[in-house]
Design a protein with these regions (language model features):
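C-terminal substrate-binding/catalytic lobe of Rossmann-fold NAD(P)-dependent oxidoreductases
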Residues: 6-7, 11-44, 119-238
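Short, acidic/turn-prone active-site loops that include or flank metal/cofactor-
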Residues: 34-36, 75-78, 99-100
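Structural motif
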Residues: 7, 50-51, 73-74, 97, ...
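Rossmann-like NAD(P)-binding element
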Residues: 41-58, 64, 69-74
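Rossmann-fold NAD(P)-binding glycine/threonine-rich loop
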Residues: 54, 61, 74-95, 105, ...
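Extreme N-terminal starter segment of soluble prokaryotic enzymes
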Residues: 1-4
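Hydrophobic beta-strand scaffold residues
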Residues: 28, 70-71, 93-96
Length: 238
């Protein structure tokens, strides 16, 4: 039975805990708001972190110290956090994603397939989340932007205002309100036609289930940095 430690006692942490309770092959080793100093976390096979960027480097250091598999879903990360993740991946298997839903992983793959024809369209990204989400644009929006334009060949325009002609750009728009679990759309706007790819999350359960799929994948893997693409399509010698 795979033993999971959850870091982060918020909405996502609670959703992961509920899903663990429904799985016969998983057990909750413990849960904490921050990385506990006690050795109890050492009993875990996998750490799942949905806490806060201020916690990310400490979580990475703990996983690296013990060689414990880490599933990292915290968003709003900066370059310093990403350096911590890369260092941890030298000592432990780390699955890092801004979104653990299967649908978003497929979405990302579809966008990568669109790169060869993306120059034929203007592109806009629209995302919506609940009123409590702090970072904007969402980590998932950034993930989708990287999938369609990995070399940053188009300027990102965050929101629109004022006057001026459209340039070589991708518009990015964030909506915050209510209890929206997460909605993401990428619009390809061409001459006399519009193609829209859209994903809507009905609840946080899809992210929790995806994180547990990632945990099963990471357990026993060699140290390295993995993505949901690796988890679902068997990358890095899966």
């Amino acid at each position: 039975m795979l033993k999971i430690w959850i870091v982060g006692r918020g909405r996502m942490g609670g959703a992961v805990e509920a899903e663990i309770a429904a799985c016969e092959d998983l057990a909750l080793a413990g849960a904490s708001e921050y990385v506990p100093e006690a050795d109890s976390i050492g009993a875990a096979d996998v750490i799942i972190d949905f806490s806060h960027p201020n916690n990310t480097c400490a979580v990475c250091e703990r996983a690296a110290r013990d060689g414990t598999a880490l599933v990292l879903g915290t968003t709003g990360l900066g370059d310093a956090h990403r350096q911590c993740i890369v260092r941890a991946a030298q000592k432990a298997p780390v699955v890092h994603s801004a979104n653990f839903s299967t649908g978003i992983a497929i979405f990302e793959r579809l966008l990568a397939e669109m790169r060869g024809v993306s120059h034929l369209f203007d592109i806009e990204v629209v995302e919506a989340h609940h009123r409590y989400k702090q970072d904007a644009p969402s980590g998932t929006a950034k993930l989708l932007l990287a999938a369609i334009d990995p070399e940053n060949e188009r300027e990102r325009i965050y929101g629109r205002g004022g006057m001026g002609a459209r340039g070589n750009e991708i518009g990015v728009h964030s909506i915050r309100g209510g209890t929206v679990a997460g909605e993401h759309s990428v619009l390809f706007l061409g001459e006399d036609e519009v193609l829209e790819i859209r994903h809507s999350a009905a609840s946080r359960r899809i992210f929790a289930r995806g994180a547990l799929t990632a945990a099963r994948f990471a357990a026993g893997k060699a140290p390295g940095l993995y993505s949901m693409q690796d988890v679902l399509w068997g990358g890095k010698d899966a």
